[in-house]
């Protein structure tokens, strides 16, 4: 009988979330490096170079890979022979306490994005709790935890469909991907859940994104069953769409396709598609009663030695000095290198600011965005003047 301490769960979750905030999984880094060397589109190649360089800088400086540090999803497999040292907290509460400690860590505070009352006032909880926790009781005497932090851009592109049993899943994915735009920040992965019921398909899709990237190994050895054939079919179809890195066109839109299935009703074929962005963040660990998880940092030497030089079609902009006349000279297709102070806000913030200004209401007292830049996903707003 194994005794698991609640503090080991809390500490392990907190450490894991800090860890994945600045360490890309190495399988993703390696897959992206291969895609970089294969890429023929210069714009897409530049985008992948910047992702890889940013990844290394994040690992070196222990700073977040992306400013959207995500909502936490946790899959917890609890062995039937496990005992807890304390029963004053549920597993959900243990995970939430770990999330709270990770996101309020003074050495590397992470952005809190979780809101209460989603259909009403949408009040930020300030510490990114609660997490979404899936608990499964399994044989054994350990606790296995898979934990991820997923940003809103990719999560918002989730697609769900109830297909007819005879419908072609690969064809549906191929038709669906172009409707998702580039807001899910490719290149990434696709997680596909098939079967069960509607909600089961969604959980399967999310859980599949926790798996190791191995599509190249599958290509080399060939598929051994229908599920692997479907993975390869979707992988090839999606990459032939030419969406490419950050939607700039190119050979690689996804570095892997994952599929998990479950038995389903004879009349049904539920399918859920969840993309993972280039800020892929997840880690797995097992608690066996000997203490908290020991997460070994990767070595910086494991990142590729890739550099990126600004090309001729590049404009350098100091945001402290730029004028409206300067902005009007920017051209579609240019690479703009920004320096200076920039504010970040989600689409909802952008919409609210625009609505206040257009209605004549104005901004709240003490809030003045004039002359400042606000980054909103792919849109940059020069407050009170123009959107470019």
Task: Set out the residue ranges of the language-model regions.
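Short, conserved beta-strand edge motifs with alternating hydrophobic and charged residues
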Residues: 187-193, 338-339, 374-378
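Non-transmembrane, aqueous-exposed alpha-helical and coiled segments at domain scale
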Residues: 1-192, 197-307
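Single conserved hydrophobic/aromatic residue that forms the stacking wall/gate
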Residues: 380-388
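A generic local structural motif
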Residues: 177, 323-324, 360-363
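Metallocofactor- and cofactor-centric catalytic cores in central/energy metabolism, strongly enriched
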Residues: 37, 56, 60-62, 71, ...
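Short peripheral tails and domain-boundary helices/loops at the edges of structured domains
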Residues: 356-377
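Pocket-edge structural micro-motifs
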Residues: 76, 149, 319, 340, ...
């Amino acid at each position: 009988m194994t005794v698991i301490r609640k503090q080991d769960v809390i500490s392990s979750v907190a450490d894991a979330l800090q860890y994945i905030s600045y360490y890309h999984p190495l399988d993703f880094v390696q897959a992206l490096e291969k895609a970089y060397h294969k890429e023929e589109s210069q714009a897409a190649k530049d985008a992948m170079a910047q992702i890889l360089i940013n990844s290394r800088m994040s690992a070196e400086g222990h700073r977040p890979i992306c400013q959207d540090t995500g909502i936490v999803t946790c899959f917890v497999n609890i062995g039937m022979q496990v005992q807890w040292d304390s029963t004053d907290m549920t597993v959900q509460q243990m995970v939430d306490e770990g999330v709270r400690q990770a996101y309020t860590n003074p050495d590397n505070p992470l952005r809190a994005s979780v809101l209460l009352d989603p259909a009403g006032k949408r009040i930020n909880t300030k510490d990114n709790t609660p997490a979404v926790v899936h608990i499964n009781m399994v044989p054994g005497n350990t606790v296995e935890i898979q934990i991820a932090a997923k940003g809103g851009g990719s999560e918002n592109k989730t697609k769900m469909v109830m297909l007819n049993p005879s419908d072609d899943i690969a064809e549906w994915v191929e038709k669906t991907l172009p409707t998702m735009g580039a807001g899910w920040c490719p290149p990434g992965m696709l997680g596909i859940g098939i079967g069960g019921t509607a909600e089961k398909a969604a959980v399967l899709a999310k859980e599949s994104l926790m798996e190791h990237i191995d599509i190249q190994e599958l290509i080399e050895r060939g598929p051994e069953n229908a599920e692997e054939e479907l993975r390869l079919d979707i992988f090839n179809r999606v990459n032939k769409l030419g969406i490419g890195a950050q939607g700039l066109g190119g050979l690689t839109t996804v570095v892997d396709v994952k599929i998990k299935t479950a038995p389903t009703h004879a009349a049904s074929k539920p399918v859920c598609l969840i993309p993972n962005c280039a800020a892929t963040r997840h880690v797995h660990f097992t608690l066996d009663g000997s203490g908290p998880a020991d997460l070994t940092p990767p070595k910086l030497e494991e990142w590729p030695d890739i550099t990126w030089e600004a090309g001729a079609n590049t404009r350098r902009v100091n945001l402290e000095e730029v004028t409206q006349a300067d902005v009007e000279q920017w051209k579609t297709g240019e690479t703009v290198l920004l320096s200076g102070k920039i504010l970040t806000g989600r689409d909802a913030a952008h919409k609210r600011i625009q609505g206040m200004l257009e209605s004549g209401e104005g901004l709240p007292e003490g809030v003045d965005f004039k002359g400042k830049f606000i980054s909103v996903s792919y849109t940059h707003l020069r407050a009170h003047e123009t959107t470019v």
